[in-house]
Amino acid sequence: MHVKKGDTVVVITGKDKGKKGKVLQVLPKKNRVIVEGVAMVTKHQKPNQQMQQGGRIEQEAAIDASNVMIWDKKANQGVRVGYKLENGKKVRVSKKTGEVID
């Protein structure tokens, strides 16, 4: 996958188009990601040991990985990701600026 946990991404399609957030979780088997503050859904929670109160909770839902692009601070926009070998290691590279992402 082109995104990793901790990356800053921008949503390129859907109701949250244009929103930026940090990747909280990557689900590679389903090709989905959970992004902070994006695709918020309301979940009804029963009272339990951790949450005595119960009630309705807002939390992030998973969105398809193809709907996000890595945010490049230098280019100040979402960029596509390429890969290249550097010192025998595969690294992610911004297609726009050519800089190593990780």
Swiss-Prot record:
Domain of life: Bacteria
Keyword rRNA-binding: yes
InterPro entries in alphabetical order: KOW, Rib_uL2_dom2, Ribosomal_uL24, Ribosomal_uL24_CS, Ribosomal_uL24_KOW, Translation_prot_SH3-like_sf
Name of the protein in question: Large ribosomal subunit protein uL24
Entry keywords, A to Z: Ribonucleoprotein, Ribosomal protein, RNA-binding, rRNA-binding
GO molecular function, one term: rRNA binding
GO biological process, alphabetically ordered: translation
UniProt record similarity statement: Belongs to the universal ribosomal protein uL24 family.
Function recorded in the entry: One of two assembly initiator proteins, it binds directly to the 5'-end of the 23S rRNA, where it nucleates assembly of the 50S subunit. One of the proteins that surrounds the polypeptide exit tunnel on the outside of the subunit.
Bilayer-spanning residue ranges: none
Organism: Alkaliphilus oremlandii (strain OhILAs)
Cellular-component GO terms for this entry: ribonucleoprotein complex; ribosome
Assembly and binders: Part of the 50S ribosomal subunit.
